Regions:
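Short, electropositive alpha-helical surface patch
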Residues: 207-225
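A short secondary-structure junction signal
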Residues: 97-99, 125-128, 142-143, 162, ...
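Short, flexible loop segments at the rims of nucleotide/cofactor-binding pockets, characterized by
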Residues: 62-66, 133-139, 171-172
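Catalytic core of membrane glycerolipid acyltransferases/transacylases, capturing the structured
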Residues: 42, 83-138
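A conditional alpha-helix N-cap/helix-loop micro-motif detector
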Residues: 52, 68, 137-141, 175-176
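Membrane-anchoring hydrophobic helices of lipid-metabolizing enzymes
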Residues: 1-84, 97-99, 109, 127
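Conserved small/polar residues in nucleotide/adenosyl-binding loops
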Residues: 226-231
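Conserved Motif II region of HX4D acyltransferases
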Residues: 82-90, 147-200
Protein backbone atom coordinates (compact mmCIF):
# COMPACT_ATOMS: atom_id res chain seq x y z
CA UNK A 1 0.00 0.00 0.00
CA UNK A 2 1.53 3.24 -1.09
CA UNK A 3 0.57 5.52 1.77
CA UNK A 4 1.13 4.00 5.19
CA UNK A 5 0.29 7.32 6.86
CA UNK A 6 -3.42 6.55 6.62
CA UNK A 7 -2.90 3.93 9.30
CA UNK A 8 -0.87 6.10 11.64
CA UNK A 9 -1.69 8.40 14.53
CA UNK A 10 -0.68 12.01 13.93
CA UNK A 11 -1.36 14.29 16.90
CA UNK A 12 -0.29 17.38 14.94
CA UNK A 13 -2.78 16.59 12.18
CA UNK A 14 -5.56 15.84 14.66
CA UNK A 15 -5.03 19.17 16.41
CA UNK A 16 -5.09 21.02 13.09
CA UNK A 17 -8.30 19.25 12.14
CA UNK A 18 -10.02 19.89 15.46
CA UNK A 19 -8.66 23.34 16.30
CA UNK A 20 -8.23 24.76 12.81
CA UNK A 21 -6.19 27.97 12.65
CA UNK A 22 -6.04 28.10 16.45
CA UNK A 23 -3.80 25.02 16.43
CA UNK A 24 -0.76 27.18 15.62
CA UNK A 25 -1.09 28.76 19.06
CA UNK A 26 -0.81 25.43 20.85
CA UNK A 27 2.65 25.32 22.50
CA UNK A 28 5.04 22.72 21.18
CA UNK A 29 5.53 21.25 24.66
CA UNK A 30 1.78 20.53 24.81
CA UNK A 31 1.80 18.59 21.55
CA UNK A 32 4.95 16.74 22.65
CA UNK A 33 3.23 15.81 25.91
CA UNK A 34 0.13 14.58 24.08
CA UNK A 35 2.25 12.42 21.78
CA UNK A 36 3.97 10.91 24.80
CA UNK A 37 0.89 10.10 26.88
CA UNK A 38 -0.92 8.47 23.96
CA UNK A 39 2.29 6.59 23.02
CA UNK A 40 2.13 7.84 19.45
CA UNK A 41 5.47 6.38 18.34
CA UNK A 42 4.86 2.94 19.88
CA UNK A 43 1.34 2.74 18.49
CA UNK A 44 2.47 3.76 15.03
CA UNK A 45 5.10 1.02 14.98
CA UNK A 46 2.35 -1.46 15.85
CA UNK A 47 -0.08 -0.05 13.28
CA UNK A 48 2.60 -0.22 10.60
CA UNK A 49 3.57 -3.78 11.48
CA UNK A 50 -0.07 -4.94 11.55
CA UNK A 51 -1.27 -3.00 8.50
CA UNK A 52 -2.16 -6.20 6.63
CA UNK A 53 -4.29 -7.59 9.45
CA UNK A 54 -8.02 -6.88 9.54
CA UNK A 55 -11.01 -7.85 11.65
CA UNK A 56 -10.49 -10.49 14.32
CA UNK A 57 -6.90 -11.02 13.18
CA UNK A 58 -6.21 -7.35 13.90
CA UNK A 59 -7.81 -7.66 17.36
CA UNK A 60 -5.62 -10.67 18.07
CA UNK A 61 -2.57 -8.59 17.14
CA UNK A 62 -3.83 -5.87 19.51
CA UNK A 63 -4.10 -8.39 22.33
CA UNK A 64 -0.52 -9.48 21.72
CA UNK A 65 0.72 -5.89 21.52
CA UNK A 66 -1.00 -5.03 24.82
CA UNK A 67 0.25 -8.30 26.35
CA UNK A 68 -3.33 -8.75 27.54
CA UNK A 69 -4.14 -11.80 29.64
CA UNK A 70 -7.85 -12.56 29.88
CA UNK A 71 -9.55 -15.23 31.97
CA UNK A 72 -12.84 -16.26 30.38
CA UNK A 73 -15.70 -17.81 32.32
CA UNK A 74 -18.96 -19.05 30.84
CA UNK A 75 -17.96 -19.19 27.18
CA UNK A 76 -20.09 -22.31 26.86
CA UNK A 77 -23.17 -20.26 27.75
CA UNK A 78 -22.98 -18.04 24.67
CA UNK A 79 -26.04 -18.50 22.41
CA UNK A 80 -25.55 -20.87 19.50
CA UNK A 81 -28.42 -19.53 17.39
CA UNK A 82 -30.16 -16.27 16.62
CA UNK A 83 -28.94 -12.68 16.51
CA UNK A 84 -27.66 -11.19 19.75
CA UNK A 85 -26.84 -7.84 21.26
CA UNK A 86 -23.93 -8.29 23.64
CA UNK A 87 -23.78 -5.57 26.28
CA UNK A 88 -21.07 -5.12 28.88
CA UNK A 89 -19.80 -2.83 31.55
CA UNK A 90 -16.85 -0.71 30.44
CA UNK A 91 -14.22 -0.69 33.22
CA UNK A 92 -11.06 -0.03 31.21
CA UNK A 93 -11.88 1.69 27.93
CA UNK A 94 -10.21 0.48 24.76
CA UNK A 95 -8.69 -2.61 26.36
CA UNK A 96 -11.97 -4.28 27.26
CA UNK A 97 -13.37 -3.31 23.86
CA UNK A 98 -10.51 -5.09 22.14
CA UNK A 99 -10.77 -8.13 24.41
CA UNK A 100 -14.52 -8.62 24.03
CA UNK A 101 -14.34 -8.07 20.28
CA UNK A 102 -11.57 -10.65 19.98
CA UNK A 103 -13.30 -13.24 22.18
CA UNK A 104 -16.73 -12.90 20.56
CA UNK A 105 -15.31 -12.41 17.08
CA UNK A 106 -13.28 -15.59 17.32
CA UNK A 107 -16.23 -17.51 18.78
CA UNK A 108 -18.63 -16.38 16.05
CA UNK A 109 -16.25 -16.48 13.11
CA UNK A 110 -15.96 -12.72 12.79
CA UNK A 111 -19.73 -12.24 12.63
CA UNK A 112 -19.71 -9.35 15.13
CA UNK A 113 -19.90 -5.58 14.83
CA UNK A 114 -19.21 -2.73 17.22
CA UNK A 115 -21.32 0.41 17.35
CA UNK A 116 -18.47 2.89 17.72
CA UNK A 117 -17.48 6.52 17.37
CA UNK A 118 -16.70 7.17 13.72
CA UNK A 119 -13.13 8.19 14.60
CA UNK A 120 -12.27 4.51 15.03
CA UNK A 121 -13.01 3.95 11.36
CA UNK A 122 -9.58 5.46 10.73
CA UNK A 123 -8.06 2.23 12.07
CA UNK A 124 -7.94 0.17 8.90
CA UNK A 125 -7.72 -3.15 10.74
CA UNK A 126 -10.70 -2.42 12.96
CA UNK A 127 -12.98 -0.78 10.38
CA UNK A 128 -14.52 -4.01 8.99
CA UNK A 129 -15.92 -4.77 12.46
CA UNK A 130 -17.36 -1.30 13.04
CA UNK A 131 -20.63 0.46 12.44
CA UNK A 132 -19.71 4.14 12.71
CA UNK A 133 -21.98 6.41 14.70
CA UNK A 134 -21.61 10.02 15.67
CA UNK A 135 -24.28 12.01 17.48
CA UNK A 136 -22.60 15.30 16.68
CA UNK A 137 -21.32 17.07 13.60
CA UNK A 138 -22.34 16.53 10.01
CA UNK A 139 -23.11 12.87 10.59
CA UNK A 140 -25.68 13.52 13.34
CA UNK A 141 -28.64 13.47 10.94
CA UNK A 142 -27.69 9.94 9.85
CA UNK A 143 -27.31 8.62 13.41
CA UNK A 144 -30.76 6.94 13.63
CA UNK A 145 -30.28 5.31 10.22
CA UNK A 146 -26.86 3.94 11.18
CA UNK A 147 -28.17 2.46 14.42
CA UNK A 148 -31.11 0.96 12.54
CA UNK A 149 -28.82 -0.54 9.90
CA UNK A 150 -26.59 -2.08 12.55
CA UNK A 151 -29.40 -3.74 14.47
CA UNK A 152 -31.14 -4.90 11.28
CA UNK A 153 -28.01 -6.69 10.04
CA UNK A 154 -27.26 -10.39 10.54
CA UNK A 155 -24.23 -9.62 12.69
CA UNK A 156 -24.07 -9.85 16.45
CA UNK A 157 -23.76 -6.40 18.00
CA UNK A 158 -21.31 -5.43 20.76
CA UNK A 159 -22.22 -2.40 22.83
CA UNK A 160 -21.09 -0.58 25.95
CA UNK A 161 -24.35 1.16 26.93
CA UNK A 162 -22.63 3.54 29.35
CA UNK A 163 -20.77 5.14 26.46
CA UNK A 164 -17.76 6.04 28.63
CA UNK A 165 -15.61 3.78 30.76
CA UNK A 166 -16.44 3.33 34.44
CA UNK A 167 -15.95 6.10 36.99
CA UNK A 168 -15.51 6.09 40.75
CA UNK A 169 -18.70 7.43 42.32
CA UNK A 170 -19.03 7.75 46.08
CA UNK A 171 -16.03 5.47 46.49
CA UNK A 172 -17.46 2.74 44.24
CA UNK A 173 -16.15 2.01 40.73
CA UNK A 174 -19.13 1.52 38.45
CA UNK A 175 -20.51 2.34 35.04
CA UNK A 176 -22.31 5.56 34.28
CA UNK A 177 -26.01 5.22 33.57
CA UNK A 178 -26.68 2.83 30.71
CA UNK A 179 -28.54 4.23 27.70
CA UNK A 180 -31.64 2.20 26.83
CA UNK A 181 -31.07 2.19 23.06
CA UNK A 182 -29.83 -1.41 23.13
CA UNK A 183 -33.08 -2.57 24.74
CA UNK A 184 -35.49 -0.77 22.44
CA UNK A 185 -33.60 -1.61 19.24
CA UNK A 186 -33.05 -5.24 20.25
CA UNK A 187 -36.78 -5.67 20.89
CA UNK A 188 -37.63 -4.03 17.56
CA UNK A 189 -35.23 -6.28 15.64
CA UNK A 190 -35.92 -9.45 17.66
CA UNK A 191 -32.46 -9.80 19.09
CA UNK A 192 -31.58 -11.57 22.32
CA UNK A 193 -29.77 -9.31 24.77
CA UNK A 194 -26.80 -11.09 26.33
CA UNK A 195 -25.24 -9.31 29.34
CA UNK A 196 -21.52 -9.75 29.90
CA UNK A 197 -19.39 -8.67 32.84
CA UNK A 198 -15.78 -7.56 32.52
CA UNK A 199 -13.67 -7.31 35.66
CA UNK A 200 -10.94 -4.69 35.82
CA UNK A 201 -10.13 -1.18 36.94
CA UNK A 202 -8.09 1.83 35.96
CA UNK A 203 -5.61 3.67 38.18
CA UNK A 204 -6.52 5.99 41.05
CA UNK A 205 -5.04 8.83 38.98
CA UNK A 206 -7.58 8.15 36.24
CA UNK A 207 -10.56 8.19 38.60
CA UNK A 208 -9.33 11.27 40.44
CA UNK A 209 -8.81 13.11 37.15
CA UNK A 210 -12.28 12.13 35.95
CA UNK A 211 -13.88 13.46 39.11
CA UNK A 212 -11.83 16.66 38.94
CA UNK A 213 -12.92 17.28 35.35
CA UNK A 214 -16.53 16.73 36.35
CA UNK A 215 -16.18 19.10 39.30
CA UNK A 216 -14.73 21.96 37.25
CA UNK A 217 -17.12 21.36 34.35
CA UNK A 218 -14.72 20.14 31.66
CA UNK A 219 -16.84 18.29 29.10
CA UNK A 220 -14.05 16.99 26.88
CA UNK A 221 -13.14 13.42 27.83
CA UNK A 222 -9.55 14.18 28.87
CA UNK A 223 -9.35 10.89 30.77
CA UNK A 224 -9.46 9.02 27.47
CA UNK A 225 -5.89 10.13 26.83
CA UNK A 226 -4.69 8.29 29.92
CA UNK A 227 -6.43 4.94 29.54
CA UNK A 228 -3.37 3.37 27.89
CA UNK A 229 -1.43 3.77 31.14
CA UNK A 230 -4.30 3.61 33.62
CA UNK A 231 -5.16 -0.08 33.57
Amino acid sequence: MADDSIFLIDIDKILKTKAGKKSKYIPRFVTSYLKRIVHQDELNVFLHDSKDKVGVEFLEACMEFLDAKVEIKGLENLPKEGKCTFVSNHPLGGQDGVALGYILGKHYGGNVRYLVNDLLMNLHGLAPLCIPINKTGSQSRDFPKMVEAGFSSDNHIIMFPAGLCSRRQNGVIRDLEWKKTFVTKSVETQRDVVPLHFEGRNSDFFYNLANLCKFVGIKFNICLLYTSDAA
